[in-house]
């Protein structure tokens, strides 16, 4: 079956953005630019970054303008487009608001104020549906998770807790989100809203933060620069979930590239959707039609 449209969802740091220690294949950027300029392709950035940091990355790395941005760890979806509109998708906000029973991040912070291990992050890192804290890196996250869940669930609030570590600052990080707010659920909501399905969607990522999508039924690509432990984990979890056929591990050598960053994205996209190979390797005219 000929592919008529593609929803291309990609993580930013160390996936689309070549900001890891591994080398980038120089020809990958040109191929990617050709691919995302096609009218058949809807480009979606999927990131933990907020709007300001996404815009900063777009300027710093000269990224193509996306059609949509899923940001703030899945709590926001923006329609962007060539006019850089940055219009929030209100339908997504309404979906995730149900989990917090009409409450905001400010309300939740008041409910958690007496927990000494939680230090609120700067206001620029918060939004209505994302409450972020600094946590001691040695903190027992299991017991703290139980306390937070018990406290909030008794108030009718259902949350997802996302733990990570800032290795530079040597501090723990915690994002308190609505239960259904995640990269995967946001992608699924956008698929439904835009009329895409599993036969014309792909996700590209590199790290543990992408794990939920990488092992889901959504066709997914792990770029070659992903850490070995991530590669082992994602293969194991995909096998357990029965989604091995929906996972592609980039290995390099595709079009004489190394599989890192954009090269890995292209390798995986062409694996799932061979029609796209012509989209980014054959020259096009100004109307984005293939030149004979």
Walk through the language-model features, giving the residues of each.
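Mg2+-dependent phosphoryl-transfer enzymes with acidic/Ser/Thr/Gly-rich catalytic loops
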Residues: 3, 177, 184-292
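Asp-based phosphoryl-transfer active-site loop
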Residues: 3-21, 214
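Active-site flanking residues adjacent to catalytic metal/cofactor-binding acidic residues
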Residues: 10, 71, 205
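Short, flexible loop segments at the rims of nucleotide/cofactor-binding pockets, characterized by
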Residues: 19-23, 46-48, 179
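A short acidic/small-residue loop/turn micro-motif
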Residues: 23-26, 225
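Active-site phosphate-binding/coordination module
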Residues: 26-123
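Conserved acidic, metal-coordinating active-site core of Asp-based
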Residues: 109-202, 207-217
């Amino acid at each position: 079956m000929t592919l008529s449209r593609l929803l291309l969802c990609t993580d930013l740091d160390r996936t689309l953005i070549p900001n890891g220690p591994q080398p980038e294949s120089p020809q990958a950027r040109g191929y990617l630019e050709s691919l995302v300029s096609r009218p058949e392709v809807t480009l979606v950035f999927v990131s933990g970054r907020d709007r300001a940091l996404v815009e900063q990355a777009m300027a710093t790395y000269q990224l193509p303008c996306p059609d949509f941005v899923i940001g703030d760890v899945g709590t926001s979806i923006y329609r962007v487009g060539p006019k850089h509109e940055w219009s929030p998708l209100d339908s997504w906000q309404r979906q995730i608001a149900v989990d917090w029973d009409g409450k905001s991040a400010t309300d939740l912070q008041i409910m958690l104020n007496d927990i000494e291990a939680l230090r609120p992050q700067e206001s620029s890192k918060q939004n209505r549906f994302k409450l972020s804290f600094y946590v001691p890196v040695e903190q027992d996250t299991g017991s703290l998770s139980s306390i937070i869940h018990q406290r909030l669930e008794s108030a009718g609030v259902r949350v997802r807790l996302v733990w990570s570590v800032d290795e530079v600052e040597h501090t723990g990080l915690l994002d308190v989100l609505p239960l259904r707010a995640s990269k995967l659920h946001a992608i699924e909501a956008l698929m439904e809203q835009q009329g895409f399905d599993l036969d014309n969607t792909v996700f590209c990522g590199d790290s543990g933060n992408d794990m939920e999508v990488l092992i889901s039924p959504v066709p997914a690509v792990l770029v070659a620069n992903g850490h070995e432990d991530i590669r082992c984990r994602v293969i194991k979890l995909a096998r357990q979930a029965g989604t091995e056929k929906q996972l592609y591990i980039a290995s390099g050598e595709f079009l004489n590239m190394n599989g890192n960053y954009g090269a890995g994205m292209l390798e995986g996209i062409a694996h799932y959707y061979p029609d796209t190979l012509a989209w980014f390797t054959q020259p096009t005219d100004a109307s984005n039609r293939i030149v004979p």
